[in-house]
Amino acid sequence: MAAYAAFKHVELYNVGKAKKRVLRPPGGGSSDIFGSEMPQTPRNVKNRMASNIFAAEKDNGVKNNVRQGAHRFYFIGDAPRRGQKTVDSHSRLFGEPTRPITPGKNHMKSSIPFGQNTEAVAAQKLLTTNGHYNGKSGSVSSASSSVSSSTENLKMNSGSRSEGNPVTGEGYKVVANEYSQRQESSNGGTPVINKNRIPPGGYSSGLW
């Protein structure tokens, strides 16, 4: 009971009473700490009846008058905000950074050489690519000669294939016998016996 009596005078008499608050900060209601009077600026009141169709308002900066979603409409005399240039403090203090001038690339110009020296240009390119000739000793093959040689090889292969029937294998020359005869003549002495190898699926598969 003594604990209740000791606590009673601290808390119970303050129940329901509001705390005292400071209504004004020290020094008055203004935030001026130096005591000088602030200049009173007149309040701007917008004239809502004034028309701004033909000219931008003098007091206000550039603004968007009507906005509807992504579409923005500008009246005569107004300019979009994107046109305003932002002032960078670095460029204002140190000037514009100097950028190296790069020449413009002509994208319409063809990279294929035309004219009479196409063979010489192709030969020069092949000569300088790897620093050595293109597989043939003492000669540089150009693109046109490689194309013509590849077409000749195709003609020769197609001619040899047309002699026989690829399905049955009839009419083809037996290449293994020619190969064994060549080796006999080259060695001169003992003939080398080569076994004829049959491809998987036989000769009638069309792959061989």
UniProtKB/Swiss-Prot annotation:
It is found in: Nucleus; Cytoplasm; Cytoplasm, Cytoskeleton; Cytoplasm, Cytoskeleton, Spindle. Its main location: nucleus. Residues 24-43, 82-106, 132-208 are annotated as: Disordered. One of its GO terms (biological process) is positive regulation of microtubule polymerization. Residues 137-150 have a biased composition (Low complexity). The modification Phosphothreonine is found at T41, T98, T102. The keyword Nucleus applies. The keyword Lipid biosynthesis does not apply. GO terms for molecular function: microtubule binding; structural constituent of cytoskeleton. Ubiquitous expression throughout development. Expressed during cell division in the syncytial embryo. Expressed in developing photoreceptors of the eye imaginal disk of the third larval stage. In adults, highly expressed in neurons of the brain, concentrated in axons. In the adult ovaries, expression accumulates in the germarium and the polar follicular cells as well as in the oocyte along the microtubule network. Keywords: Cytoplasm, Cytoskeleton, Microtubule, Nucleus, Phosphoprotein. Residues 82-93 have a biased composition (Basic and acidic residues). Residues 151-165, 178-189 have a biased composition (Polar residues). PANTHER family: GEO05313P1, MICROTUBULE-ASSOCIATED PROTEIN JUPITER. This is Microtubule-associated protein Jupiter. It comes from Drosophila melanogaster (Fruit fly).
